[in-house]
Amino acid sequence: MLTKLFLKKKFEEYYSKNEVELPRKFKNREFAFVPLELLPDFVMHRHISFRSETDFRAYILSNVPAHIYFSSAYYERPAEDKMENKGWLGADLIFDIDADHLPVKAQSFEKALEMAKREIKKLTAVLRADFGIRDMKIYFSGGRGYHVHVHDEEFLSLGSAERREIVDYLRLNSPKIVVEDRFANSNAAKRVLNYLRKKLEEDERLTSKLKIKPADLKKEKLTKKVIRAVEKFDYSALSIYIDAPVTADVKRLIRLPGSLHGKTGLRVTEVEDIESFNPLKDALAFGDEAVVVKVARKLNLSIGDFSGKIYPGRVKLPEYAAVFLICRGDASYDS
């Protein structure tokens, strides 16, 4: 109980002192909240809308949330309980890269964030180069990954089927590169072929290994040698491991920028420069005032300016580190 009271006080202080970034056309969005006081039960209160920023701030200060979400969709009546009565008007295109969904599992929180960063860089490069997307924002999720919000008008009206095609293109789900003796005419196949052609042009050793040349990939009718080479080439480095259901869902709830992630105490933070961004420094929401916590097991922790081993028992930590461990369930508040 003491730990929850401490956490509620800290979250309330954060929201009283900091502005939270309301989404575009927020009056047409559904909001959802997980009350902190109900933790560890994850109880979501949803189908909520706001007419003003003042109303929103009053709500979160009187109902301190552990998590805040908003809908990717725009609605005529966002507060309606039944989805079919909301009046769907369109939805932002959302991408979620979470370290938990990557094929290689990280051994630490820090490594997970590094892996997610590499993946988000691949994603945004393809979105710009292949889709011509310019109006998008990158956010650190507050957890183990990143979100991309695309606001380009031409994507707003896409249904789930069209969004799944984008997922297939990015993840290369069964691209069917070769059909009989010709290259498939799908966007995913073209993406793979462009990648292979570029690799062949860059690396003569690959040309020798596969026994084909870049020009062979431009021929209308393919030889068996070219087909075999294309089909056995490893394209895994080209696949981007986005969370498919998030992108395909036209009514998805996504974390609100500027809000706190209840399982880390980190802030959902806009990323201006992905190269230099360090979530364990740049997404800290709390100060460095000393807080005493009780730790149950030996830990290695690197966050903010703190780095080192932590042993079981009473430990004095900077506030941001204490909140992080408490939210993750690795420590309890000890007054």
Swiss-Prot record:
Cofactor(s) annotated in UniProt: Mg(2+); Mn(2+)
Keyword Transport: no
Active-site residues per Swiss-Prot or TrEMBL entry: 96, 98, 243
Keyword Metal-binding attributed: yes
Keywords, alphabetical: DNA replication, DNA-directed RNA polymerase, Magnesium, Manganese, Metal-binding, Nucleotidyltransferase, Primosome, Transcription, Transferase
Enzyme Commission numbers on file: 2.7.7.-
One Gene Ontology biological process: DNA replication, synthesis of primer
Alphabetical list of InterPro entries matching this protein: DNA_primase_S, DNA_primase_ssu_euk/arc, DNA_primase_ssu_PriS
Highest taxon, organism lineage: Archaea
UniProt GO MF annotations: DNA-directed RNA polymerase activity; metal ion binding
GO cellular component, one term: DNA-directed RNA polymerase complex
Free-text function comment from the UniProt entry: Catalytic subunit of DNA primase, an RNA polymerase that catalyzes the synthesis of short RNA molecules used as primers for DNA polymerase during DNA replication. The small subunit contains the primase catalytic core and has DNA synthesis activity on its own. Binding to the large subunit stabilizes and modulates the activity, increasing the rate of DNA synthesis while decreasing the length of the DNA fragments, and conferring RNA synthesis capability. The DNA polymerase activity may enable DNA primase to also catalyze primer extension after primer synthesis. May also play a role in DNA repair.
Homology family: Belongs to the eukaryotic-type primase small subunit family.
Self-association state and partner proteins as the record states: Heterodimer of a small subunit (PriS) and a large subunit (PriL).
Descriptive protein name: DNA primase small subunit PriS
Biological classification of the source: Archaea, Methanobacteriati, Methanobacteriota, Archaeoglobi, Archaeoglobales
